[in-house]
Amino acid sequence: MQHSDTLITHVDHRRLRSLLDQDSPTEQENVAALRQRLRGARVVSPSRIPRNVVTMNSQVVLRNLDSGDRMTCTLAYPSEARASRRHVAVTRPLGTAMLGKRVGQIIRWPGGARERRLRIQSVPYQPEAAGAMNL
């Protein structure tokens, strides 16, 4: 079954499938969720992905719906994720929740003792919109 609200470029889909096929022990707790996200996503050409969709290496502004706090982060591959640069690995629960979602959508992910609810406020940088189709 496809999740109509999840769009992924064929480049991201291929790279993420390859990453999951490596069966690395890192981030194992969320691998099943990421596999499910990939299975249900609608896969499109990088040139056809809307500018408001979170793709790999996108910079994303999120608003916490409970506290009102805003945070900016970049969705990254695990090997490229650096906390000091506010990168979120796609293999982490927040990263998987953001992947393929659009501006305005609410994402939910486990955070501490309770579920967190974040709204995607904007995508200031998306590689595909910037012409970087293979990032």
For the regions a protein language model found, what residue spans apply to each?
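Intrinsic-disorder/low-complexity coil detector
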Residues: 24, 49, 109, 123-126
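Peptidyl-prolyl cis-trans isomerase
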Residues: 48-59, 128
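Generic detector of short, locally flexible boundary/turn motifs and exposed helical patches
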Residues: 22-29, 37-40, 71-75, 82-87, ...
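Weak global preference for isoleucine
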Residues: 8, 49, 106-107, 120
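Non-DNA-binding regulatory cores of transcription-related proteins
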Residues: 56-61, 66-117, 124
